[in-house]
Regions:
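Single conserved hydrophobic/aromatic residue that forms the stacking wall/gate
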Residues: 1-11
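Structural motif of enzymes handling amino- and sulfur-group chemistry
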Residues: 12-33
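Conserved glycine-rich beta-strand-loop-beta hairpin in the small C-terminal domain of fold type I
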Residues: 18, 31, 35-45, 57-71
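Residue-level recognition of strand-loop junctions within catalytic nucleotide-signaling folds
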Residues: 22, 70-72, 116-118
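Short, conserved charged micro-motifs
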Residues: 75-84, 121-125
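PLP-dependent enzyme catalytic core of the Aspartate aminotransferase-like
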Residues: 90-91, 104-134
Protein backbone atom coordinates (compact mmCIF):
# COMPACT_ATOMS: atom_id res chain seq x y z
CA UNK A 1 0.00 0.00 0.00
CA UNK A 2 2.77 2.48 -0.76
CA UNK A 3 0.40 4.82 -2.61
CA UNK A 4 -1.98 4.99 0.34
CA UNK A 5 0.92 5.96 2.62
CA UNK A 6 1.98 8.66 0.18
CA UNK A 7 -1.54 10.08 0.13
CA UNK A 8 -1.63 10.11 3.92
CA UNK A 9 1.69 11.94 4.02
CA UNK A 10 0.41 14.57 1.58
CA UNK A 11 -2.72 15.13 3.66
CA UNK A 12 -0.65 15.49 6.83
CA UNK A 13 1.77 17.89 5.11
CA UNK A 14 -1.10 20.04 3.84
CA UNK A 15 -2.71 20.07 7.28
CA UNK A 16 0.56 21.17 8.87
CA UNK A 17 1.01 23.94 6.29
CA UNK A 18 -2.60 25.07 6.78
CA UNK A 19 -2.12 25.31 10.55
CA UNK A 20 1.08 27.28 10.08
CA UNK A 21 -0.65 29.73 7.73
CA UNK A 22 -3.69 30.03 9.99
CA UNK A 23 -1.43 30.89 12.95
CA UNK A 24 -0.28 34.01 11.06
CA UNK A 25 3.42 33.19 11.15
CA UNK A 26 4.09 33.50 7.44
CA UNK A 27 4.67 37.30 7.26
CA UNK A 28 7.30 37.17 10.02
CA UNK A 29 8.96 34.14 8.50
CA UNK A 30 9.06 35.75 5.05
CA UNK A 31 10.57 38.95 6.45
CA UNK A 32 13.28 36.94 8.20
CA UNK A 33 14.04 34.77 5.16
CA UNK A 34 14.21 37.80 2.86
CA UNK A 35 16.68 39.49 5.21
CA UNK A 36 18.88 36.39 5.49
CA UNK A 37 19.01 35.79 1.74
CA UNK A 38 19.60 39.47 0.97
CA UNK A 39 22.60 39.42 3.34
CA UNK A 40 23.92 36.25 1.72
CA UNK A 41 23.44 37.63 -1.79
CA UNK A 42 25.27 40.82 -0.84
CA UNK A 43 28.09 38.85 0.79
CA UNK A 44 28.44 36.70 -2.33
CA UNK A 45 28.57 39.74 -4.61
CA UNK A 46 31.05 41.57 -2.40
CA UNK A 47 33.28 38.50 -2.14
CA UNK A 48 33.18 37.87 -5.89
CA UNK A 49 34.20 41.46 -6.64
CA UNK A 50 36.99 41.31 -4.04
CA UNK A 51 38.39 37.85 -4.79
CA UNK A 52 37.78 37.40 -8.52
CA UNK A 53 37.73 40.99 -9.76
CA UNK A 54 37.72 41.23 -13.53
CA UNK A 55 38.08 37.44 -13.95
CA UNK A 56 34.27 37.21 -13.89
CA UNK A 57 31.15 39.16 -14.82
CA UNK A 58 27.89 38.85 -12.91
CA UNK A 59 24.77 40.77 -12.04
CA UNK A 60 24.09 41.27 -8.33
CA UNK A 61 20.92 39.25 -7.69
CA UNK A 62 17.84 41.12 -6.47
CA UNK A 63 16.08 37.88 -5.56
CA UNK A 64 16.41 34.13 -5.82
CA UNK A 65 19.15 31.96 -4.38
CA UNK A 66 21.84 32.00 -7.08
CA UNK A 67 24.41 34.16 -8.80
CA UNK A 68 24.79 33.55 -12.53
CA UNK A 69 28.35 34.42 -13.57
CA UNK A 70 30.56 34.35 -16.63
CA UNK A 71 34.32 33.88 -16.70
CA UNK A 72 36.09 36.54 -18.74
CA UNK A 73 39.51 34.91 -19.02
CA UNK A 74 41.04 38.26 -17.98
CA UNK A 75 44.72 38.08 -17.11
CA UNK A 76 45.05 34.61 -18.61
CA UNK A 77 42.74 33.12 -15.97
CA UNK A 78 40.42 30.15 -16.54
CA UNK A 79 37.62 30.89 -19.01
CA UNK A 80 35.75 27.56 -18.94
CA UNK A 81 33.22 26.79 -16.20
CA UNK A 82 33.71 23.04 -16.55
CA UNK A 83 37.48 23.36 -16.07
CA UNK A 84 36.99 25.69 -13.12
CA UNK A 85 34.48 23.28 -11.54
CA UNK A 86 37.12 20.54 -11.44
CA UNK A 87 39.72 22.89 -9.97
CA UNK A 88 37.23 24.24 -7.44
CA UNK A 89 36.42 20.75 -6.17
CA UNK A 90 40.12 20.28 -5.46
CA UNK A 91 39.86 23.40 -3.26
CA UNK A 92 36.77 22.06 -1.47
CA UNK A 93 34.21 24.21 -3.29
CA UNK A 94 31.44 23.13 -5.64
CA UNK A 95 29.22 24.98 -8.09
CA UNK A 96 27.26 24.14 -11.22
CA UNK A 97 28.83 24.87 -14.62
CA UNK A 98 26.45 26.82 -16.83
CA UNK A 99 26.45 24.51 -19.85
CA UNK A 100 23.54 22.27 -18.69
CA UNK A 101 21.27 25.33 -18.55
CA UNK A 102 21.49 25.96 -22.30
CA UNK A 103 19.19 24.31 -24.86
CA UNK A 104 21.74 24.78 -27.64
CA UNK A 105 25.10 26.46 -28.16
CA UNK A 106 26.13 26.55 -24.49
CA UNK A 107 28.39 29.28 -23.20
CA UNK A 108 31.21 27.32 -21.56
CA UNK A 109 32.34 30.37 -19.61
CA UNK A 110 29.18 30.46 -17.50
CA UNK A 111 28.47 29.00 -14.08
CA UNK A 112 25.94 29.25 -11.25
CA UNK A 113 26.78 29.82 -7.59
CA UNK A 114 24.33 29.22 -4.75
CA UNK A 115 24.06 31.19 -1.54
CA UNK A 116 21.01 29.23 -0.35
CA UNK A 117 22.54 27.12 2.40
CA UNK A 118 25.85 28.73 3.37
CA UNK A 119 26.12 31.48 5.96
CA UNK A 120 28.01 34.70 5.20
CA UNK A 121 31.33 33.43 6.59
CA UNK A 122 31.14 30.22 4.53
CA UNK A 123 30.25 32.24 1.43
CA UNK A 124 33.33 34.41 1.88
CA UNK A 125 35.52 31.36 2.48
CA UNK A 126 34.09 29.54 -0.53
CA UNK A 127 34.61 32.49 -2.86
CA UNK A 128 38.19 32.88 -1.60
CA UNK A 129 38.79 29.22 -2.44
CA UNK A 130 37.19 29.76 -5.83
CA UNK A 131 39.64 32.60 -6.37
CA UNK A 132 42.49 30.19 -5.65
CA UNK A 133 41.07 27.75 -8.21
CA UNK A 134 40.99 30.38 -10.93
Amino acid sequence: YPLRRQRQMCIRDRATAAQYLKAGRMPGTLAHVRKVYAERAQAMGDALRKELGDAIEFVQPQGGLFVWARLTGAGGKVADGNVLAKRAIEKGVAFVPGTPFFCANPDHATFRLSFATADVDKIREGVARLGQAI
